[in-house]
Amino acid sequence: MATKKEETFYELYRRTSLGICLTDALDDLITNDRINPQLAMKILANFDRVVAETLQEKVKARLQFKGALDNYRFCDDVWTFVIKNINFKLDGGNQTIQADKVKIVSCNAKRPGTDA
């Protein structure tokens, strides 16, 4: 009998606008006894998987950015950069987007716990 190995994905995208809205909606459903917490965890795990796969397969756009590196750190195979006075420029576009401060979190492209 074959057993299916559970794949794990980074939970980074739960901190995006969409992830926060999903988490809030699930919390409301749990509070109102509409779903149980185990189902909410399965939904969030599915969200993590789908967002990671979609970004990897569908998004091909590139951008350039330039700014002043304020601080950086490397912990548990995750790089974190805080950049101030940053300018973004999308490929093929003449428009520049500016921000006072941006936090970039970079993880290994390999799935956690795998060598692939």
Swiss-Prot record:
It comes from the Eukaryota. The keyword Hydrolase does not apply. GO terms for molecular function: RNA polymerase II core promoter sequence-specific DNA binding; TBP-class protein binding. GO terms for biological process: positive regulation of transcription initiation by RNA polymerase II; RNA polymerase II preinitiation complex assembly. InterPro entries: TFIIA_a-hlx, TFIIA_b-brl, TFIIA_gsu, TFIIA_gsu_C, TFIIA_gsu_N. Keywords: Nucleus, Transcription, Transcription regulation. The keyword Transcription applies. It is found in: Nucleus. GO terms for cellular component: transcription factor TFIIA complex. TFIIA is a heterodimer composed of the large TOA1 and the small TOA2 subunits. TFIIA is a component of the transcription machinery of RNA polymerase II and plays an important role in transcriptional activation. TFIIA in a complex with tbp mediates transcriptional activity. Belongs to the TFIIA subunit 2 family. PANTHER family: TRANSCRIPTION INITIATION FACTOR IIA SUBUNIT 2 (PTHR10966). This is Transcription initiation factor IIA subunit 2. It comes from Pyricularia oryzae (strain 70-15 / ATCC MYA-4617 / FGSC 8958) (Rice blast fungus). The lineage of its organism: Eukaryota, Fungi, Dikarya, Ascomycota, Pezizomycotina. The gene is TOA2.
